[in-house]
């Protein structure tokens, strides 16, 4: 880690089709081995699936899903006097959004299904409807933070 100055935040450019930064953030997380065009193709086909299944704007559904999956608090392990406490910490919106995207993709990968396109589209739709593993993960994180609220003064 550099001691000179804080690293600049990298600005995420919007994607070419939807002109949205959120879509590009999702593509960058889908990306494997530098194959960005494949990641774009997967996401755009998933968005097309969402449009056919819901008859609504897929970008609206995606935004809604990520908004509902974004956590407000997280727990951080903090060692105090030989024992480790899970300390609840409020997180910034950008960090919460990144967590929501990560949870969305891991939940989609764990789903049963033929291919990743259908799994991803189904997970996005389920998250937008307040069901699915992504929402369960968010609620579990909030529950953890609530149960460890007594350790909040260890920040």
Swiss-Prot record:
One of the primary rRNA binding proteins, it binds directly to 16S rRNA where it nucleates assembly of the head domain of the 30S subunit. Its main location: plastid. InterPro entries: Ribosomal_uS7, Ribosomal_uS7_bac/org-type, Ribosomal_uS7_CS, Ribosomal_uS7_dom, Ribosomal_uS7_dom_sf. This is Small ribosomal subunit protein uS7c. Belongs to the universal ribosomal protein uS7 family. CDD domains: uS7_Chloroplast (cd14871). One of its GO terms (cellular component) is small ribosomal subunit. The lineage of its organism: Eukaryota, Viridiplantae, Streptophyta, Coleochaetophyceae, Coleochaetales. GO terms for molecular function: rRNA binding; structural constituent of ribosome. Keywords: Chloroplast, Plastid, Ribonucleoprotein, Ribosomal protein, RNA-binding, rRNA-binding. NCBIfam families: rpsG_bact. GO terms for biological process: translation.
């Amino acid at each position: 880690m550099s001691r000179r100055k804080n690293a600049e935040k990298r600005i995420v450019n919007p994607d070419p089709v939807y002109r949205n930064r959120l879509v590009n953030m999702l593509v960058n997380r889908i990306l494997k081995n530098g194959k960005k065009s494949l990641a774009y193709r997967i996401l755009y086909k998933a968005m097309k699936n969402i449009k056919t299944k819901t008859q609504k704007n897929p970008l609206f559904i995606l935004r809604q899903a990520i908004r509902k999956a974004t956590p407000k608090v997280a727990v951080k392990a903090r060692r105090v006097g030989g024992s480790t406490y899970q300390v609840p910490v409020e997180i910034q919106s950008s960090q919460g959004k990144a967590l929501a995207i990560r949870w969305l993709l891991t939940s989609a990968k764990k789903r049963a299904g033929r291919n990743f396109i259908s799994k991803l589209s189904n997970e996005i739709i389920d998250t937008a409807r307040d069901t699915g593993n992504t929402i369960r993960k968010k609620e579990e994180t909030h529950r953890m933070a609530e149960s460890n609220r007594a350790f909040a003064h260890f920040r």
